[in-house]
Structure formats: C-alpha cells, structure tokens
Amino acid sequence: MLALIFITTSVWLAASQKTFTPDLVFPEMNRNSSWSVANYGEILCPTSFQSYEPKKHQILTRVLVERPSLNTDTKVEGYTCHKVKYETICDMPWYFSPTISHSISPLRVKESECKDAIAEHQLGTHVSLSFPPEDCSWNSVNTKAYEDIIVKDHPVMLDPYTNNYVDAIFPGGISSPGMGGTIHDDMMWVSKDLAVSPECSGGNKVWGLFIHLGCMGGGSRCWKSAPPHRGPQGQEPHFSLPVSFYNKIGVRFHDGEWMKVSVNLDHPNSVTFQVTDFPPCPPGTTIQTAVVENINPEIQELTVNMMYRLKCQETISKMVSGLPTSVFDLSYLIQVQEGPSIVYKREKGVLYQSVGMYQYIDTVTLNTEENQLGENARGQKVFWTEWSDSPTRPDPQEGSNGFFKYEGQIRVPLGMSLRLEAATELMWGHPVHTVSHPILHVISNHTEQSVTTWNRGVNSTNLIGQATRSISGFYNDLKLYLILALIVVSIVALVVLDVIPFKYILFILCPPLLLCRFIKCSTKEA
C-alpha cells in the first residue's frame, strides 16, 4: 500500500512539474538604472552564440571554427578631424522684420587641414569658432559663414595579424596605419603613434565546436588581409570582407575577428562548410558553400551563428551610415547567454544603452497577464512594464532589445534563440550551396511586424549634423511701429484740423524721431 501511494505521488509530482524550456534571454535591471547615449562606433557584436540545449552540442559531426587569437584590448590612440561650416543668415523683408537663422553643415576635409588642426589641438592653441554675427540690410538676404575643424580623441583597435586599424568608421571596417579616410566625407582619422604588430605565435589545429588558434607555422606576418572594399560613392559600406590564411578563405568582421568554418564528417567522405564569398559585393551576389546533402544540427547551428554575426554587423553598418533600422535590428546586438551585458533601447530615434543581468526566460506564458514576458528558471513571472501610459501613445511602442508592444500584445524576437528552427528553414528552404544574399533576412520573418525608423542624430559618429534655428524680430519691433504710427496719425490730424501751421511740424517731429532712434538702438543693444 505504501509503495502504491509512493508511486502515485511520484507520478502526480512529475506530471505537475513544469518543464523549463528557455527560448529567450532578458535582462533584469535596477529601477534606478541609468541610461547613456550609445556610440555606434563602439558597439561590438557578441563573438559567439551558445545553444541552450546541451543535446545540440553532442559532437556527432566534428566542426572546426578557425580564428586568430585577437587581442581585443589592443588599442591605438588617434584623432578624428571633422570639418563644419557655421552660417548666420539674416533675411530682412521690406517691412523691417528680420529673421536670423543659424545652421551647421559638414564640409569635405583635406589632409593638410586635418594635420594643421591636430597640431593646434596638441599645442592647445586651437580656437573654436561659433556662429558669425548677423549682417542685416533692408529687403535682402545676407549670409556670413565661418569654417572650423573639430578635433576629437578617437581610439581604434589594432589587428596584430595585419598591423591595420579596425573601427566602424573606416570603409570596410579597416584602415592602413597613419592617416585614413572614413565613411564620412567630412571626417578623417589620424593615429597619434604608429603601432607595431606583435609577432604571431605557433599553434596546432584542434577539432571542436568553437576553437581559437593562432598561426600555423612561424613568421611575423602569418595572416594576410584582402584589400578593404570601399564601394561606389554613397553606397552603404559593408563591415565584413573575405580574407585569406594560407589559401584558406574566411570572413573578417569589422572588429577585427576572422573566422573560417569547416565540417569533417565521421566517415571517409569529408565535407567542408566554408563561406567563400560574402559581400562587399553588388546586389544579387551569392554566398557559396561546399555543403551538398548533409544536414545535421551542428551544421545548422553553426550556419545560423554565422548568419546572426553578419546580421549584427549589418545593423551596425546601417546605424553608422544613418540608414533606416527596424526595432528588431536591435535584437542582433545583444548576447544570448546569462550574465551581465549591455541593454539597448531607442527613444525618439536615439539609441541608449545601460547594463543588465541577463537571465533565461520561457515565453510559453507570454502575454498571459498584461506585460508578461514569461517565467524564469525559478518559476517566477517576468514582466516588462516600461511602456507609455499616455492616451496618445504610439502603436506599436518600442521596448528594449528589440521588444515592442502592438495592439496590447508584447512581441519578442524569438528567432534569436530558436536558431535551430530558423536554420532548418534556412537549410531546406534554399539550397545551401548557393544561398542568395536576401536570405540573411529570413530569420527576422519570425518576428512578425517590423517598424522602420530613420535614425540620425546624437548616436552617429558624424559629430555634427544639420541644425537650424530661427529667431524672429517682429514682436521686438512691434512697439516701435506702434509709436511711429501714432506720431504720423497725430501729425496728420493736427495739420488737417489746422491746429498747428505746417511750418512748425518739423519742430514737433524732431523730438519723437530722436526718441524712436533711441528706442531702436536700445532694442539692438538688448
């Protein structure tokens, strides 16, 4: 009898116990967490994505990811030179109501101008200019302009394998040592000191899922980079490019990481999975791989990891270039592991960042209660309540990390964690050996509606965009016009009524004119 009770109780407990299947990571944040404006040039993508289910990592197929041991702390100090023009425009119509406009616009900077400005900056003799004084004249539009070069400190990363500089502001994400152009015509970057690349160290090839290794063989320049792609003028810059290592082709990301993927099956017929051609390229160029028939979880997982990394780089490229980005683009910037990391949100077109403690979330109870995201591993309900309470609130509303609320329901980018499911669609829906470039957007199809916003402003690496303000002087001069009108009407009335002879009008008119002159001068000085 006791055994029957024990078995029945065990079965009931097992049936009542919920299975925790996390499909999302979400950050816990303090109520007093501070948000700061994010700098697009400093955003780095997660270096890898780990699967939540350990069974996915059973090595049925041996997978090799080859990466150089890049020291991400190697920085090179330098400056950015940004040339701008300050304009003051005075538009005075015939009725004496001037409008003063101030505008700031970028100008193409020359190498000699940049060097001179940096020399003045280092000596502390550079004088920052502002808007010139207005020059107003009746019934005309006058413009006065000053030009200035703004010098800012801007460190970049050193690639120790090519001795090149890596940063999002460079075309293709990479620049040769010394002075280099940026993706902005009005900005140049100059290094303070030429850095020396450390020597490559020898290493052995190791099989595994994610393997870091150094150079195979000796020598100080073991790794060779392809020339950076600059593209046609005005074209969106790409932040990854093919590079070679002893005739092996991989992908180089804008933060300096190089990756080559290969798969060797556990039978004599080995298969190599390798990205051999990824943009920079014209539209329609394909991604070529050598995989033909073999579909397995490890290949799928690795494929999607690569795709997500490229999507993250594409998102950074959009933001740096001021191109439209969707709310779900932010989801490609965040990590998918537990632990502390950066949290992003957008408000009125400005990207902000803070720090949160990421935890696994099971979204099976998503929207069961208002603002509920799901439950964590402890069985606690997780909510996101930072939504607008205004009656005129927009629909949809943006949350953090690519979340948004639409028609009262929270929508989350579950494709970020359900990579195996997305990979199945990716692998079977399109032939792997020739994957067209638009396939990079397939994963975001799981995120339902996307909201596109033009994003330019404080986050941009462009230090100064277009700014205009107008000051109207009509109301300041209104009292002067009223006084003049009153004087004229009074004089006409006195003459018509023959109260005062006309010859005395000049004696009466002089004091008021002097008074008006005084008022006008006082108004200018104020």
From Swiss-Prot:
Protein's GO biological process: symbiont entry into host cell; virion attachment to host cell
Subcellular location as annotated: Virion membrane
Predominant subcellular localization, coarse grouping: virion
Record's keyword terms, sorted: Glycoprotein, Host-virus interaction, Membrane, Signal, Viral attachment to host cell, Virion, Virus entry into host cell
Entry-linked InterPro entries: Rhabdo_glycop_CD, Rhabdo_glycop_FD
One GO cellular component, as annotated: membrane
Signal sequence region: 1-17
Superkingdom assignment: Viruses
Glycosylation sites: N32, N445, N459
Official protein name in the record: Spike glycoprotein
Species annotation: Sigma virus
